[in-house]
Structure formats: C-alpha cells, structure tokens
Amino acid sequence: MKTGIKGVRRASAVIVTASAILAGGVLTTPAHAAAPPKPSITAKGGFVMNNGSGKTLFTKSADTRRSTGSTTKIMTARVVLGQRNLNLDSKVTVQKAYSDYIVRNTASSARLIVGDKVTVRQLLYGLMLPSGCDAAYALADKFGKGSTRAARVKNFIGQMNTTAKNLNLKNTHFDSFDGIGNGKNYSTPRDLTKLASNTMKYSTFRTVVKTKSTKQKVTTKSGGYRYMSWSNTNGLLGTYRGAIGVKTGSGPEAKYCLVFAATRNGKTVIGTVLTSSSAANRTTDAKKLMDYGFKVA
C-alpha cells in the first residue's frame, strides 16, 4: 500500500494546524467577559453590597456624612425590635402630643387618631409604610425610659446612638427619632446599608418593609374599632423584580434618599443613595445600582 506525498503533506498540515491552534490558545478556556461599566447616579452618595457576603459592589462618597431624612426610621425600628422581651401585640394609646408634633413640623403622618389603641406591630407598619412621624413618636414614648415624655424621648434617641455604636457605624449620629433633626442627624451610605442589613435579620422588619399596602384594625377610644390603611412610599415595590424593601427619606437638607434591597436567584443586594435630586431620580439611581450589583455580586 502506497502513501502518496500529497497524503503525507495533508497529514502534516493537519498536525501543524492543530499545533498552531493549541499554541494560539483558541482551544483554551475563554477569557472572562469585560466587567460591566459602573453606573452614573444623580445622588451625591451611594453604596451597594452583597448582603450575604458583605462584599462591597459600588461606592460613591460612601463615607461622607449626610442628612438622612426619614431613613432614620430604620434605626427607630431597630431599637424597638432589639428590646428585651418585646411584645409586638402590646397596645399603645395615641396621645395628643403625637398629632400636635405632626402639625407643628408639617411632618409625614400615619394619621393616628388621639385616644385610639394601636399595637407595637401596627406602629411599625405606620412607621415604615407611610413614614409616620407620629408612629415614630409613639414608639419613642413607649420604649424610652423616664418619668416624663421628654425624658423618654431623649432616652430613646440615646438608645439609637448606642445601637449605632454597637453596630460600628462610625459616621452615624441621631438627634431625633424620625429624621427631623437639629443639625446632628447624619449618616453615610455605607453605614445606613450596614444598619439596614442588620435590621433585615428581624423577620418582623422584613415582613413590614416588603408590604406595599396594609389595612389594620385598631381599637377606638370608645371601645369600638376602625381600620387604618397605609401605603408604602417605596416605589421599588412592585416595579423592580425582587424588591424587598426598605425605606425612603426626604427633607430640606436630605433632599431625596432611599435605602433599598432586592433578591434574585437566591442573591440579595442591599444599598443606599443619599441626596438625590428628586423622588423619581432616587428610584432610578437605586434600580441602576441594583442592576449593577446583581451583575458583579
């Protein structure tokens, strides 16, 4: 049997070509895809992390102290949920001081009615959904220690700052129970994200902040009942796939803030934007950061 010169050349060519391919790396593992570009946000500060691993995914002035607006109420809830022997079904009687506070400060309200009896659990809904400063006041009055309302409120704010210290939130300080501060109510995107991540460990908090709307039955002064309806100010719920919370904030100095979280395919990203330029832009900023976070987490 003859092996022609052409056959030998063809065989040699195949060997040479295969060697060249291997040498060129064509058959080796493909290179990693290019990293997605970091998003541009209108907010002056932003931070995102993988909630499971704690890995930082995005920063923009993440450690610059800024006014927090009603995102302060995450700490209000955290202090309540951290109370020993907490009874979420214990009742609180709504005081006139709470409604007077709303009127005096033109503050966001859960529309609590003087004389009604509401549970601590219901106050948490009133705190986190409509961002009720009256609910925040009621909780501070309930869980602060002291013989006067002023003393109890001062003590509760002290508990907020102690909790911040215990959570190693080095750039955070509170001088109010609701975010209507006196110049010393501040935090950072990183610190607020860490606070939210810690507070999300409480199942009650997780349930509350993912709720779009609720109707709560409360006891009236006369012993009857009425229903209180509250809707969540967080526009991410129902508009961003996997959104699970957590809290909006706004104010003259704070502008527009949002602490946010979402879960997709078993992975949760959580973050904060502070001092955005509008309610719409803070939501857009958050969506951009979560989209990016899920790509790089």
Which residues does each PLM region occupy?
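Short alpha-helical segments used as structural interaction elements across diverse proteins
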Residues: 6-7, 70, 279
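Secretory targeting and sorting signals
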Residues: 1-33
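Active-site-adjacent loops and short helices of periplasmic peptidoglycan-processing enzymes
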Residues: 32-190
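Penicillin-recognizing serine hydrolase domain
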Residues: 34-45, 144-297
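Hydrophobic alpha-helical segments, especially transmembrane helices
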Residues: 10-11, 74, 264, 268
